[in-house]
């Protein structure tokens, strides 16, 4: 039985640090909180944590040598549909996990500068501390789903409830107040079967606009603060879209398994697809992509529609340069599960500042 309640709050422990001098924030602020996840007081399993799902896939017999440094390439927060565990990777190994038990799917995950982990699990959004305490929880109503969230400062979260109709919402986690609620267009407002595939990602940009990939309606729409459409780009099955620092938009087309960078004038300025990869490196369901500060793009390859025994043959992520050179292949089914998304913790920027991270 799924336990449902609209809001549940817990009061986190607040630790104040006093600085003797003011200065610019660190280039990669999340690196300073990673030690909390391996502290002696962190339990192996949190009181509200779900049981880990058994790994029922076989380990690949022989993994060829791949470009890059494997798990040591980036410290990252990693999650994927089909295996409900969030992995924290640091110094080339998994150092912390959070499992949600069976049911639903994890599609979006964030580490905040206070060390908290914010994530969606199809029927709820949750925030947990490195010490595995749940400090905020929001269950969506029956018949709706949630696949995307974004921190807006430390006290607010943007999410989209797939439903009839779907709704973009901004919730104040401290007060429980719904500060923004706006219905979005949908292919149907009466057919429950259309709820699940409506949205997988929506992001607020640095300018306060909303970038919405309509997965079923084959378009990406940017809305201003009053929800007036100001830019539209048509593309099959856009799973995710992110506004880049250069003003372009990076879009993931799940149907055609490609990632495309589009200018404000809707001109394609860069594209990466399966044909750009060397033999033996095969992408499956591309769902998300992230542009790194060094200009590289990381593309995640999920396992949707595959059998368990096929999973170990699927590449989980690749990192490519602007000129399409392959510099990293993530292929590690011994330590990780399927890949939908990851947040790279060595990237500059503040996660709860919209637009700081290109993800």
Model-assigned labels for residue ranges:
Residues 23-359:
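Histidine-/acidic-rich catalytic cores in large beta-rich domains
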Residues 9-19:
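Bacterial N-terminal signal peptides
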Residues 1-11:
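Bacterial N-terminal signal peptides that target proteins for export
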């Amino acid at each position: 039985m799924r336990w449902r309640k609209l809001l549940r709050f817990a009061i986190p422990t607040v630790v104040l640090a006093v600085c003797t001098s003011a200065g610019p924030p660190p280039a990669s602020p999340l690196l300073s909180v990673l030690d909390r996840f391996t502290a002696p007081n962190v339990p192996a399993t949190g009181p509200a944590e779900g049981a880990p799902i058994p790994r029922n896939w076989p380990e690949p017999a022989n993994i060829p040598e791949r470009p890059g440094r494997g798990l040591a390439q980036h410290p990252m927060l990693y999650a994927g549909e089909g295996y409900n565990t969030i992995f924290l990777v640091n110094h080339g190994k998994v150092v912390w996990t959070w499992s949600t038990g069976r049911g639903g799917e994890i599609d979006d995950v964030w580490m905040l500068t206070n060390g908290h982990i914010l994530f969606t699990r199809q029927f709820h959004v949750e925030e947990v501390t490195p010490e595995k305490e749940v400090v905020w929880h929001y269950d969506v109503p029956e018949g709706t789903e949630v696949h995307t969230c974004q921190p807006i400062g430390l006290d607010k979260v943007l999410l989209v409830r797939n439903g009839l109709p779907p709704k973009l919402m901004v919730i104040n986690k401290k007060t429980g107040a719904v500060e923004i609620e706006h219905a979005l267009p949908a292919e149907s407002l009466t057919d429950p079967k259309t709820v699940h595939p409506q949205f997988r990602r929506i992001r607020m940009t640095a300018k306060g606009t909303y970038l919405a990939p309509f997965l079923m309606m084959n378009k990406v729409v940017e809305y201003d603060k009053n929800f007036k459409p100001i830019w539209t780009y048509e593309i099959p099955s856009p799973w995710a879209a992110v506004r880049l620092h250069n003003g372009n938009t990076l879009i993931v087309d799940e149907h055609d398994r490609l990632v495309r960078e589009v200018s404000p004038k809707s001109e394609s300025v860069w594209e990466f697809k399966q044909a750009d990869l060397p033999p033996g490196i095969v992408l499956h369901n591309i769902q998300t992509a992230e542009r790194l500060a060094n200009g590289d793009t990381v593309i995640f390859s999920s396992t949707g529609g595959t059998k368990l025994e096929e999973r170990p043959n699927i590449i989980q992520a690749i990192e490519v340069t602007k000129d399409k050179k392959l510099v990293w292949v993530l292929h590690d089914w011994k330590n990780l599960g399927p890949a939908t998304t990851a947040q790279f913790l060595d990237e500059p920027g503040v996660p709860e500042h919209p637009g700081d991270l290109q993800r």
